[in-house]
Amino acid sequence: MNPLVYIVMFGWIPFVIYLFRWVPAQRAVIISFIIAWLFLPVVKFHFSGLPDYTKMSATCYGILLATIIFDIKRFSSFQLGWLDLPMLVWCLCPLASSITNGLGLYDGLSAVLDQTVTWGLPYYLGRLYLNNLDGLRKLAIDIFIGGLIYIPLCLFELRMSPQLHRIFYGFH
């Protein structure tokens, strides 16, 4: 695997923390997720006993750490409500499925942890930082700007075939 993949993936958490230092927290969350989704490599690092380390998990871990460091009071503003119930069920579903299928508690808890990192953490961070119309407006504007930035890359790939991921990260 290309060394740039390791640099980008394991340097992402410090970058997100640095971003929180210089940009308002809400903007840092939005920028972190958009840049990660558009530009980080599609790769999974498997660590025994832990959820896979992907671009989304790296972003979530970075935002959680940055929130603990720079915006710890934000956690106290979160209140679990009825609208959060579907996500809670979605994150806990693998446990029931694993036990029902005879795979055991360990496999079920592992799947719950993976599901929570993949879906629950982004949801939770969105609820923490984007829980009002102003936050959603900023998110929509930044997604639009991210799309505009991505257009030249899409045009290049239309002409040259999907090559940018291979060029930068060494695989597709």
PLM regions with names:
Residues M1-M9, S48-I63:
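Membrane-interface anchor segments at the N-terminal boundary of transmembrane helices
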Residues M1-P3, P14-Q26, V42-D52, K73-R74:
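Short, hydrophobic transmembrane alpha-helix segments
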Residues F10-I13, T59, Q115-Y123, L139:
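Alpha-helical transmembrane segments of multi-pass membrane proteins
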Residues F10-V23, T59-D71:
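Hydrophobic, aromatic-rich transmembrane alpha-helices
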Residues W12-V16, L65, L121-G126, L148:
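Transmembrane alpha-helical segments
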Residues V29-F33, Q79-W90, D114, G126-F156:
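Interfacial loop-to-transmembrane-helix boundary motif in multi-pass membrane proteins
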Residues V29-F47, M56-G120:
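N-terminal hydrophobic segments of proteins, predominantly signal-anchor/transmembrane helices
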Residues I99-L105, I151-H172:
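Membrane-interfacial helix-loop-helix modules of multi-pass inner-membrane proteins that assemble, modify
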